[in-house]
């Protein structure tokens, strides 16, 4: 299926030093600009955040301080990113809540005014959440391969919830432990 575009749609993703918008920094940006004629233009850049990347964050995205030590700072490439995104609508995964606000804040931090008015935003995660149930019945089907009958009956719901937890413990033994203190902190 082809997308119907009246102007470019920029799919983009950021890797950062953390989740704090206005406090953390971008270490990688990737953009796929889809033009109305179907042409695809790629932009990718690793960036020196000029602050340390916490080890726990490096373990998530695989980018270390050493890998970006000689890369340009965001300030040095903000202008080219601004021009690449000019006249684009945006798309991403959880982009409306993280990537777009983070990028706009970084642009403002380095003195680049980036206008969002008139742009359209496509968040693939929002589409996923609206079209794929994220309720007890869906979790029961996913983890237990059973259909939940009598949903919203308290007895059926607690039984299903218990079975889901047991299935999660079986499915994710490397990441979760059958210990209430651990599960509480998870």
Q: Which functions belong to the PLM regions below?
A:
Residues 12, 122, 156:
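Active-site flanking residues adjacent to catalytic metal/cofactor-binding acidic residues
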Residues 121-135:
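Short alpha-helix plus adjacent loop in nuclease-associated cores
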Residues 147-152, 156, 175, 180:
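Cysteine endopeptidase catalytic domains of the caspase/legumain-like
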